[in-house]
Amino acid sequence: TREEYTRFLLPDKALTRRFYPISIEEPDEELTLSILSGSIPSIEYETKVKNTFSANTTERILRTLISISIPANQPDDQPAKRPELPLTLLEMAFSYAALSGKTALSCEYIEQAVHHSNRLRKEIRTNFTCAL
């Protein structure tokens, strides 16, 4: 982060010659959706769990994960930018399915991922349902 660069690297001349700050804007919702969609095949490969939802249902699920991941729904001390939190929730859902010995992703595991995430406020976690 810029804060870490200023705090740790900038005071050290040798490090400032080797590291340069690069500013990257947070992706918008559409780009985040594209990133998440593009990540599914590698998550499937790693977990051996398949996404068997239709393309439309998958898009609705991903948009839901993106929408609940807004900063207002996160604890004040742990803000995350897109696509970090929705991607983490997606990976957790696949992992819960894999740990349960399942080969297909279901709403149950998406709900588990959200309910067990400490990166969302309690009221978001407890009220979340994967309504398709």
Could you say what each language-model-derived stretch is?
Residues 1-132:
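AAA+ P-loop NTPase nucleotide-binding core of proteostasis motors
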